[in-house]
Amino acid sequence: MGKLTLLLLALLVWLQYSLWFGKNGIHDYSRVNDDVVAQQATNAKLKARNDQLFAEIDDLNGGQEAIEERARNELSMTKPGETFYRLVPDASKRAATAGQTHR
């Protein structure tokens, strides 16, 4: 009976070692699980960006309003007969804002 107990104990120790430190053990499982969580977070960010880009593409394909808005905002374009006014904050506000952004 003693040899069987010793054999079973040795088998248990070997199995525990394999579970904790062996290939595909608990350590590898936790590392891979962390990698999966990080990849899922990256995928979620990229999916949100893709959804935003697809929405913008649909908006641009859908009508002239989006194209006109983009031309006005990014290129400062105006329609014939319109006057473009740019409101510039006074120097003291610009200096205060510039000082806050460089901190």
Curated annotation (Swiss-Prot):
Q: Where are the transmembrane segments?
A: 4-21
Task: Please report the record's description of how this protein sits within the membrane.
Answer: Single-pass type II membrane protein
Q: Name one Pfam family in it.
A: DivIC
In this entry, the parts of the chain located on the Cytoplasmic side of the membrane are: 1-3
Q: Where in the cell is it found?
A: Cell inner membrane
Indicate the segments annotated as coiled coil, or none if absent. Answer: 33-62
Q: Which interval of the chain is the signal sequence?
A: none
Q: What keywords are annotated for this sequence in UniProt?
A: Cell cycle, Cell division, Cell inner membrane, Cell membrane, Coiled coil, Membrane, Transmembrane, Transmembrane helix
Q: What processes does the entry annotate via GO biological process terms?
A: FtsZ-dependent cytokinesis
User: Where is it found, in Gene Ontology cellular component terms?
Assistant: cell division site; cell septum; plasma membrane
Top-level division of the source organism's lineage? Bacteria
Assembly and interaction partners: Part of a complex composed of FtsB, FtsL and FtsQ.
Q: Which family does it belong to?
A: Belongs to the FtsB family.
| Function statement | Essential cell division protein. May link together the upstream cell division proteins, which are predominantly cytoplasmic, with the downstream cell division proteins, which are predominantly periplasmic.
- Which NCBIfam families would you find in this protein's record? PRK00888.1
Name assigned to this protein:
Cell division protein FtsB
Q: What is the lineage of its organism?
A: Bacteria, Pseudomonadati, Pseudomonadota, Gammaproteobacteria, Enterobacterales
